[in-house]
């Protein structure tokens, strides 16, 4: 039986954020180095607390993603094992981010019509970086090859309740020429970052997490797509593009 919760993400998106989408859209569109927005206190406090309380442990058997030179001590790929080890209620909550209320909010905020959520959570869902961990600057893969859809929007929500600026792990947004970082965003609790995804929306958290950080850097990553003829062009699709690759 599904546990009754004292919050409702669907109606929070519908009643709190959807009415603000048109007002926020201009700031999103004009943000540099590429369209993005930072929204604090994004989830109802009870909802954010619940997700943090039940966030999968680093020892969860579904976590994977071995180290390489671009990402170190970063856990992800939990969806590849069908979320085994993740509490049932937490799995149910993921679907609220694929709901009509949230998708319409994303459409109106970004101006991108025909947004399609990802029930497979390919590359997304629960991520965490351990002390010493980092994620190199990169542009994400641009095509869902399984469904032939173009990737358009990333949504990142952070669950780090005691985070301080000295712990590293800031999300960095770089210019399209990969010359410099133009925005640094601290991954503080219940902060949401939404940005338009393209082949030059370079981002990452290259500064390693401090060894004395009292918690792992935890985030929920959600990716959204749209139909586009270019998704059928083998020459257009690419995997992750890493800085200095």
Language model feature labels by segment:
Residues 1-32, 238-245:
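Fe(II)/2-oxoglutarate
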Residues 2-3, 132, 143-151, 160-245:
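Catalytic core of Fe(II)/2-oxoglutarate
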Residues 9, 16, 25-109:
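Non-heme Fe(II)/2-oxoglutarate
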Residues 36, 138, 203-205:
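Histidine-centered active-site/metal-ligand motif
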Residues 41, 128, 187:
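Conserved strand-loop elements at the edges of beta-sheets that form or border functional pockets
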Residues 54-56, 84-89, 94-151:
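Non-heme Fe(II) oxygenase catalytic core, chiefly the N-lobe of the double-stranded beta-helix
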Residues 59-60, 113-116, 161-165:
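Proline-centered turn/helix-capping motifs that create local helix->coil transitions or kinks
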Residues 154-156:
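Eukaryotic charged/polar low-complexity linker/IDR segments
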């Amino acid at each position: 039986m599904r546990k009754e919760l004292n919050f409702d993400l669907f109606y929070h998106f519908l009643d709190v954020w959807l009415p603000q989408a048109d007002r926020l859209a201009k700031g999103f569109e004009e943000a540099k180095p590429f369209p993005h927005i930072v929204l604090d206190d994004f989830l109802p406090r009870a909802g954010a607390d619940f997700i943090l309380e039940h966030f999968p442990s680093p020892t969860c058997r579904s976590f994977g993603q071995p180290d390489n030179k671009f990402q170190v001590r970063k856990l992800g790929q939990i969806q590849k094992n069908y979320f085994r080890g993740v509490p049932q209620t937490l799995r149910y909550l993921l679907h609220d981010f694929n709901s009509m209320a949230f998708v319409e909010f994303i459409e109106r905020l970004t101006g991108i019509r025909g947004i399609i959520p990802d029930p497979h959570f390919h590359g997304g869902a629960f991520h965490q970086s351990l002390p010493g961990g980092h994620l190199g600057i990169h542009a994400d893969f641009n095509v869902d090859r399984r469904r032939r859809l173009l990737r358009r929007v990333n949504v990142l929500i952070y669950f780090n309740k005691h985070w301080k600026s000295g712990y590293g792990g800031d999300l960095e947004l770089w210019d399209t020429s990969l010359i410099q970082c133009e925005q640094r965003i601290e991954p503080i609790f219940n902060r949401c970052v939404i940005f338009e995804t393209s082949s030059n929306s370079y981002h990452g958290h290259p500064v390693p997490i401090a060894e004395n950080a009292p918690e792992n850097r935890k985030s929920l990553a959600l990716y959204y797509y749209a139909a586009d003829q270019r998704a059928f062009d083998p020459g257009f699709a690419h995997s992750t593009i890493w800085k200095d690759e």
